[in-house]
């Protein structure tokens, strides 16, 4: 599934989605080929690069969690 407009809009949404997917910061980092410290950073300050946000969203979707922005930002099982 191609994501055109990233639905990742805030750091709380990222953390909630990661936990819902049953991923640790380390395992999500491994899925994205980044260090777990980068995940911790993104959970405090969301990435502004749309490509990074799309990669994160794809990794979460691959683990069964979809992000959404309407009516409010959140995450749900895909």
Regions found by a protein language model. Name each.
Residues 1-20, 68:
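A short, Lys/Arg-rich alpha-helix, primarily the initiator
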Residues 14, 28-29, 39-42:
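Conserved hydrophobic/aromatic packing and binding residues within compact polymer-binding modules
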Residues 14, 25, 53:
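Helix-turn-helix DNA-binding elements, focusing on the entry/boundary residues of the two helices
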Residues 33-48:
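Recognition helix of helix-turn-helix/homeodomain-like DNA-binding domains
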Residues 50-69:
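DNA major-groove recognition helix of helix-turn-helix/homeodomain DNA-binding modules
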Residues 68-78:
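Short amphipathic recognition helices of helix-turn-helix/homeodomain-type DNA-binding modules
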């Amino acid at each position: 599934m191609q994501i055109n407009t990233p639905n990742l809009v805030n750091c709380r949404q990222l953390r909630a989605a990661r936990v819902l997917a049953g991923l640790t910061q380390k395992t999500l980092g491994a899925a994205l080929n980044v260090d777990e410290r980068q995940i911790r950073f993104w959970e405090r300050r969301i990435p502004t690069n749309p490509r990074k946000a799309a990669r994160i969203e794809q990794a979460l979707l691959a683990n069964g969690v979809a992000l959404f922005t309407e009516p409010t930002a959140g995450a749900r099982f895909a």
